Amino acid sequence: MAFSSGMSADFAELDYRQTPLGDLVLRRRRLRNLDGIEVFEVKLGEDFLMSSLFHEVEVALADLGIARLEGGDFDVVVGGLGLGYTARAALKNSSVRSLVVIDFLQPVIDWHQQGLVPLGKEITADARCRLVHGDFFALAADPGRGFDPFTPSRRFHAVLLDIDHSPKNLLHERHADFYAEAGLRRLASQIYPGGVFALWSDDAPDPEFLAVLGKVFTGCEAQVVRFHNPLLEKDSASTVYLARR
């Protein structure tokens, strides 16, 4: 990849776009204090959305969610493409028949299709996978339309969601309705009986959200996923919520 003009070999801004949610930046850094590893980062406004340095929980989101399914030939939805770690983890599972990945930000989809991010070519080359530009939360609230633009009202075996920082720390206030009982019921209607809803959260397990989740789904739990943070030289943790339809 070419470096942006005027920038050092240790830092490159690969793309900058204005979006309805704020300025979106894709950048690459080389961390010399970590053996020169290349790190890809996405920033939206003042929020750091994702980093390739930390992706263990994104992978766990797919692995834990799909592991709770029985049988095979699963149709899966991923809400939030990001740098592609959840999507790739899902596609590594041979029992996944199809994958629909929904992202509100067209530039993020463009990065993958243009090969600007490390996993882009692998994900877009997989015939099972389709990247859809859309509002996950609007589609979750409209079962008659559903997540698949080619098959209205289609149901799925698993929905894996990684968009907001947590059920209470939202990228946009309009997402709040999704995490209430009525919003979760609309989501559940798009999941097959026995299917799974899995949700990433950067916060510790929230008993209040678990209680709401339990009004709609069964077998609800919050798994803490720990990973090493080499920048802080200590372990960090996030949460994966799991629930069965």
Per-region residue spans from a language model:
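Short, basic/glycine-rich phosphate-binding loops at helix/coil junctions
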Residues: 37-45, 162-167
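Short glycine-dipeptide loop
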Residues: 191-197
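The AdoMet/dcAdoMet-binding core of the Class I SAM-like
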Residues: 55-190, 220-221, 225-226, 234-236, ...
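Short strand-turn motif at the edge of the Rossmann-like AdoMet-binding core
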Residues: 163-164, 200-204
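Class I S-adenosyl-L-methionine
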Residues: 18, 203-245
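Glycine-/small-residue-rich active-site loops that bind phosphorylated ligands and cofactors
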Residues: 49, 198, 205
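N-terminal auxiliary segments of SAM/dcSAM-dependent transferases
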Residues: 1-37
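Class I SAM-dependent methyltransferase Rossmann-like catalytic core
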Residues: 22, 28-29, 42-73
